[in-house]
Swiss-Prot record:
It comes from Danio rerio. The lineage of its organism: Eukaryota, Metazoa, Chordata, Craniata, Vertebrata. It is found in: Nucleus. This is Transcription factor AP-2-epsilon. Coiled coil: none annotated. Pfam families: TF_AP-2. One of its GO terms (biological process) is positive regulation of transcription by RNA polymerase II. Sequence-specific DNA-binding protein that interacts with inducible viral and cellular enhancer elements to regulate transcription of selected genes. AP-2 factors bind to the consensus sequence 5'-GCCNNNGGC-3' and activate genes involved in a large spectrum of important biological functions.
Length: 423
């Protein structure tokens, strides 16, 4: 082992200021004359510092050049000088390759990379786990390390490549639902008549029972509301919302009443969107369910048939007619009777759906659709009520014709009596 003091060292190449030994040799000799000697071990025992890739230890060439005046001494810090030289060479080679490559390719532009930035000290990462666009980046002059340095950004690039896009933007990958929800299915399967779904339950099934609004307390009756009726109330022309439908079904008002009603309707395959506006004007008939409306029409027909004063009205109007107009009036009554009979026959052929029944139409589609529209607004009350009213009118026509026939016969007999009296 050789022991030397730095006070006696002198670099032969004149670069004493660039090495630690040269700097020490320029200091005051008196102040450092008694400095302890430095011991140097052979170069094979020296452990250089570890540098991660792309600077493998095996590729570093440590300079073993000796000074001319001291051939037996190694370089004091050979690893630092060789590392500096390797960095300079790598930077110049990367710069030359970047300039020769010219502009970036289209995938680089899609990722908004800056061609003026060089990253010689960052390794290429994960070029094998991405799509074609990412592989093209790995082959480019900047490599995959030019995109971002964080693992989160690399994961974002993997998701973008899986989606087939290279735009590093705010667009996120949204998984497609495996199946559509109830509202989407209802939107796809809406029909013209209502909000019925393809998976709606049996229309004849009873949804709930509703107490009547028009009955007295002593004879309160309940009417069954079917699924088909609820479907018709949600469909055009009424398009009831949750508030009106809850009132029709006599449901108590609560904080979450609308949501509970929508959830129950979804169970039977019906959709009632929140914030929906009604389509038709609200009338007194809107509050009636179909069972009570039909009951009202039946009672109205019974009263018209039994209690309508057809004879009294016919006698009153016949007395208002001049005797010379009686034949003309009789012809008018007969024609009106035929017209009324035609209309009643047409109304009797109405096959609008009502309650749990859905009869087969026997009229033309245009006429039947119009009658169905009227029936949906009156909930089964309109057509039977019209037929009952027309039946009462027909009773009046029959009584008027009887009076005219009786009057003519009475006048003819009176004329014969006068002729006999003159003779």
């Amino acid at each position: 082992m050789l022991v030397h003091s730095y006070s006696s060292m002198e670099r032969a190449d004149g670069l004493s200021s660039s090495s630690p030994g040269g700097r020490l040799s320029q200091l005051n000799q008196a102040a450092y004359s008694s400095a302890p000697p430095l011991c140097h071990t052979p170069a094979s025992d020296f452990q250089p510092p570890y540098f991660p890739p792309p600077y493998p230890q095996s590729s570093l060439s440590y300079s073993q050049s000796q000074d001319g005046g001291y051939p037996h001494l190694p370089e004091p810090y050979p690893s630092l000088n060789s590392l500096h030289q390797h960095q300079q060479a790598a930077w110049h080679s990367q710069r030359s390759r970047s300039e020769d490559a010219g502009l970036l390719s289209q995938p680089h532009r899609a990722l908004s990379l800056d061609p003026r930035r060089e990253y010689p000290g960052v390794p290429r990462l994960l070029t094998h786990g991405l799509g074609d666009g990412a592989a093209a980046l790995g082959d480019g002059p900047l490599g995959m390390h030019a995109v971002h340095h964080g693992l989160d950004d690399i994961q974002g690039l993997e998701e973008a490549s899986a989606l087939g896009i290279l735009d590093h933007s705010v667009i996120k990958k949204v998984p497609l639902p495996s199946k559509l929800n109830g509202s989407t299915i209802s939107a796809l399967s809406l029909s013209k008549e209502g909000l019925g779904l393809g998976g709606v339950s049996n229309p004849a099934e009873v949804f709930c029972s509703v107490p009547g609004r028009l009955s007295l307390l002593s004879s309160t009756s309940k009417y069954k509301v079917t699924v088909g009726e609820v479907q018709r109330r949600l469909a055009p022309p009424e398009c009831l919302n949750a508030s009106l439908l809850g009132g029709v079904l006599r449901r108590a008002k609560s904080k979450n009443g609308g949501r509970c009603l929508r959830e129950r309707l979804e169970k039977i395959g019906l959709n009632l969107p929140a914030g929906r506006r009604k389509a038709a004007n609200v009338t007194l008939l809107t509050a009636l369910v179909e069972g009570e409306a039909v009951h009202l029409a039946r009672d109205f027909g019974y009263v018209c048939e039994t209690e309508f004063p057809a004879r009294a009205t016919a006698e009153y109007l016949c007395r208002q007619t001049e005797p010379d107009q009686l034949p003309t009036r009789r012809s008018m009554l007969l024609a009106t009777k035929e017209i009324c009979k035609e209309f009643v026959d047409l109304m009797s052929q109405d096959r609008s759906p009502l309650g749990a029944s859905r009869p087969t139409p026997c009229l033309e589609p245009g006429v039947q659709s119009s009658l169905t529209h009227f029936s949906l607004l009156t909930h089964g009350f309109g057509t039977p009520a019209l037929c009952a009213a027309l039946s009462a009118f027909q009773s009046y026509l029959l009584e008027a014709l009887k009076l005219l026939d009786k009057g003519e016969n009475g006048g003819k007999n009176h004329h014969d009596k006068e002729l006999k009296h003159r003779k």
